[in-house]
Amino acid sequence: MPTLRIAVRKFDPFESAIRRQFADFARAVDHGAGLELEVLELNDLHRRLFEQRGLADGSLDITFLSTDWLAEAQAAGLIDDLTPRLARAPIADFPQAWSPSLLELQSFAGGFWGLPYHDGPACLIYRTDLLAEAALAVPRTWAEFHAAARRLHAPRLGRHGTALALFPDGHNSFYDFCIQVWSRGGDPFGDGARPRLCSPAAAEALEFLRALAADDAAVAPGAPELDSVKLGLLFCEGKVALMTNWFGFAALGERWRESRVKGRIAVAPIPRGTGYGGRSVSLNVFWVLALAAGSRQKELAWSFMRHAATAPMDKLTTLEGAIGVRRSTWSDPDVNRLIPFFHELEVLHEHARQLPVHPRLADIARVIDDLLAKATATSLPVESLLREAQERVERIVA
């Protein structure tokens, strides 16, 4: 009996959704195949796919792949171009059933490298009850965000104003820094991922993150140990009043059995900088299902990928606690009864920016991890820290 092997980013809704989707697939297609999942934390997943070459050696058939790893995987020949398979065995209503922003990041180097699976633009997530009790408006600037976090900070009640996810996994710090720079009218990278870190916007962004991280009257302790998942769970447990994080954690707060904040959650655009050029932006990073180049059962793998991309299975992804990627799911009445703000995904995507496409983006992200770690743990001038990071990234992309 064939066994489909899938590498999954550790997150309970991913695992439960894939298992249920495969069970539905098995009922619909009598192939007699089994399922084996490798559930891995973020850094372990990257190591399994790239350093250990699990995508090339035949030990995996499908993987969850973050869009900022796509160029690295494609350049190393680790994933298959899906264009020929879409031509031979197309997916119904592809591509019009998806927002263009969920198809662009996979379209490069003459191919299409992954099917969207889990969405989650970054956004402001907040407790409606706490803002109302404090007579606070929804923060529209970073200064207002910081002030609201201070106002709502109440450790004696087991609640912090906000929290930062600074665990050095090549994602959280990197994303937060890019959002901070963009929201101040800057751009941390140009064409080909050329760094633009020695700018007033980058300096202002780093100063803000340093000041926020140091403010124990606004921020939960332990930021270097928090990743986006742990931060999201803190919010769902009622321990954080507001945060910038992935939309999926707002949805989780409405669906998770152990949530303490159900019915008291709302989302809004990310705050902007206060200076000239300040604007609200989001970050478009999402998870795709990619076909392992070394898979020995690609027809079976593609058949399951097509099944998981159907409208009922995308809705199931959402009902399990992740975030579906089809427009039909975003507007689905059942989904919006459970998660009243789910339809706002379309609007959030209108403000979404993208990270540069580069095969060494993971290495660039580690430089920004180091930058944030030094900024929040030392008093070194931000200009010297940014100059050092600029030089390191220049060497990477040279």
Regions found by a protein language model. Name each.
Residues 39-49, 142-147, 221-233:
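Short helix-initiation/N-cap motifs at beta->coil->alpha
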Residues 149-151, 192-223, 270:
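Glycine-centered hinge/linker elements that transmit conformational signals in sensory
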Residues 215-217, 255-323:
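Extracytoplasmic/periplasmic substrate-recognition and gating elements
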